[in-house]
Amino acid sequence: MNKIKMIVGLGNSVYKYNQTRHNVGFWYINMLSSFYKTSLKFKKKFSGYVSSFFLNNNKIFLLKPDLFMNLNGYSVFALSSFYKIKLSEILVVRDELDLSPGILKVKYGIGHNGHNGVKSIINTFEKKKPFIQLCIGIGRPEFKKNVSNFVLECPSKIDTINIKKAILKFIFLTKDYIYKKEFLKNKKIILI
């Protein structure tokens, strides 16, 4: 496994989706860029908002694709190709229906669990190599509600608080070693 050189938050670029469950990957990138005092700037050639910061002399790029979720892979591929970053050096941050709000899970592999943004990344890269995902729990809808509608709705106030607390705790827990290989071995679920 390689060191992390790029962190991408998956989401839909349309403004009305900013605070929805499906955009928690964007929430993560916004909070991380704020934590490291770096600002995201739109870069047309990468179809997304890009920034970078140094952590213990290791440069880490941040990316928020400016595309719909099912096209996020194109933005990820454009930035990673330009800077010669392998898929295995990318941390993909995304929402996860199978985890409750406030629970995070790091997973390593090539599975997408039905997530269209992750599918887009897998389909865009020629070599199907394992990569790291930070799955942010958003919970499942009650009473078999339509999942597509559920992920495009804003979470409740308490769920929003739990999700943001979990993100912040993860940022604090990983700030000293996210660039190290040891980070990749940690697949624990974090309860907040």
Swiss-Prot record:
Localisation per UniProt entry: Cytoplasm
Signal peptide boundaries: none
EC number(s) per entry: 3.1.1.29
Gene Ontology MF, one: tRNA binding
Binding annotation for tRNA: Y17, F68, N70, N116
Entry annotation: catalytic residues: H22 (proton acceptor)
Annotated site location: Stabilizes the basic form of H active site to accept a proton: D95
Top-level EC class as recorded in UniProt: hydrolase
Catalytic activity of the protein: an N-acyl-L-alpha-aminoacyl-tRNA + H2O = an N-acyl-L-amino acid + a tRNA + H(+)
Keyword annotations of the record: Cytoplasm, Hydrolase, RNA-binding, tRNA-binding
Stated role: Hydrolyzes ribosome-free peptidyl-tRNAs (with 1 or more amino acids incorporated), which drop off the ribosome during protein synthesis, or as a result of ribosome stalling.
Quaternary structure and partners: Monomer.
Protein name per Swiss-Prot or TrEMBL: Peptidyl-tRNA hydrolase
Organism: Buchnera aphidicola subsp. Cinara cedri (strain Cc)
Taxonomic placement: Bacteria, Pseudomonadati, Pseudomonadota, Gammaproteobacteria, Enterobacterales
